[in-house]
Amino acid sequence: MQRTQIVDALAATAPQPVIRLCGWVRTRRDAKGFSFLEINDGSCLANIQAIVDEGIPAYANIGAVSTGAAVDITGELVESPGKGQKWEVRVQTLTLLGAADAETYPLQKKRHSDEFLRSIAHLRARTNKYGAAFRIRSEAAFAIHEFYRERGFFYVHTPILTGSDCEGAGEMFRVTTLPVEGSATPASGNRYENDFFGKECNLTVSGQLEAETLALGLGKVYTFGPTFRAENSNTPRHAAEFWMIEPEVAFADLEEDMNLAEDMTRTVVRRILDRCAADLDLFNRFVDTTLVERLRQIADEPFARCSYTEAIELLLKSGKKFEYPVSFGLDLQTEHERYLAEEHFGKPVIVYNYPKEIKAFYMRLNDDGRTVAAMDVLVPRIGELIGGSQREERLDVLEARINEMGQNLEDYWWYLDLRRFGSVPHAGFGMGFERLLMLLTGITNIRDVIPFPRTPGNLEF
């Protein structure tokens, strides 16, 4: 018999004489002559109640059906006389698919700490909080693909292994087949020419440069995949492995780039509000009681916008004492970003035209010679959600910027070719997917919105 998901069973419009469900037992409660099972299969937040009568043959083994056990049941879907849900199942057959020892199964019917659940990340998807978080993660990923498809973008794949450093920060994971001892260093006698690719190889920090090459042939593209940063930051906002959404648009300027970033953010928020009401309600009740209200504001109201220069002036006039200094030429820190988004504007704000010294070489130099056509989207409770720019399309200016940043022109010969052959204005941005999920759920630690977090000192699973 075909299996029905619990989300569909609970949405039934009429009783069913026979239905088959599979799932994990959340609780078992025994009464005289029968037992109540709460079963969840991950398809939704809600459990379904199954009533097992002592008259069925499988009832003899009901003692083995403990919290965490996997079961396969068939029975009649009937209206539930109790409050809380419309349907329940009167079990006709019950098969124990996988037992779970009640003494050692780590998930019991109580609220576990996030720290404890990170230590059993292989099981935490069975909890209400993390089941909801990962369903929202799935729905958000689908909404992003949907957004770009509706607007004529092509989804492209960029390499994980790379010989270039998009950010120029040098915080990259090295990949090598050379002996680990000494790796490719002069002292070890190992050379990059002896390595697998014959040159230095790293895990990508961004698919942007490669996406630009595809945009300057396909017009509008986006990439959505994993990126890696060997940044030894043990903070709630940083992970060594995370996912990025990176669109690139030919013939676009900074204004179009900012419009796209805002449109994408608001559209995805709107779709999560529409499609994940039950899961959002969980986070609104137990994680952040202002979550849904804040998401509705993001969906409904245009973002604020101000230049970097204006942002610095607002921070200086705020009267607040910040931990990090505020001055033209210094990058905005998280405390500055959050003040602008939370306290001054009270909603997301796009800050644009940053000093060239604090931005990457590929960002277009403005006519003032001091700033670049860069933008960041700052959101309440998080800070930076998106970073983007109009890309530098002028060959001579780009070469000068690469030299200024101490990069090797030869490493970017293919990137410079884009400016030699039919160069056009173009723009793009990167959004950290996990930061978007923190915005959508109210979860404050990036380790809790990705199934298996990779952070300094943590490589389990």
UniProtKB/Swiss-Prot annotation:
Q: Does the keyword Aminoacyl-tRNA synthetase apply?
A: yes
EC numbers: 6.1.1.22
Reactions mediated catalytically: tRNA(Asn) + L-asparagine + ATP = L-asparaginyl-tRNA(Asn) + AMP + diphosphate + H(+)
Gene Ontology cellular-component annotations: cytoplasm
Q: Which GO terms of the molecular function aspect are on file?
A: asparagine-tRNA ligase activity; ATP binding; nucleic acid binding
Per its UniProt record, what PROSITE patterns does this chain match?
A: AA_TRNA_LIGASE_II (PS50862)
Transmembrane region(s): none
* One example of a Gene Ontology biological process annotation: asparaginyl-tRNA aminoacylation
What enzyme category does the UniProt record give? Answer: ligase
One of the Pfam families matching this protein, by short name = tRNA-synt_2
- Top-level division of the source organism's lineage: Bacteria
Q: What is its main location?
A: cytoplasm
Task: Respond yes or no to whether keyword Ligase is given for this record.
Answer: yes
Assigned keywords, A-Z: Aminoacyl-tRNA synthetase, ATP-binding, Cytoplasm, Ligase, Nucleotide-binding, Protein biosynthesis
Query: What subcellular locations does the record give?
Result: Cytoplasm
- Describe its partners and assembly state: Homodimer.
Q: PANTHER family, from UniProt?
A: ASPARAGINE--TRNA LIGASE, MITOCHONDRIAL-RELATED (PTHR22594:SF34), ASPARTYL/LYSYL-TRNA SYNTHETASE (PTHR22594)
Family per UniProt? Answer: Belongs to the class-II aminoacyl-tRNA synthetase family.
**Name used for this protein in its record:** Asparagine--tRNA ligase
Organism in which the protein naturally occurs: Nitratidesulfovibrio vulgaris (strain ATCC 29579 / DSM 644 / CCUG 34227 / NCIMB 8303 / VKM B-1760 / Hildenborough) (Desulfovibrio vulgaris)
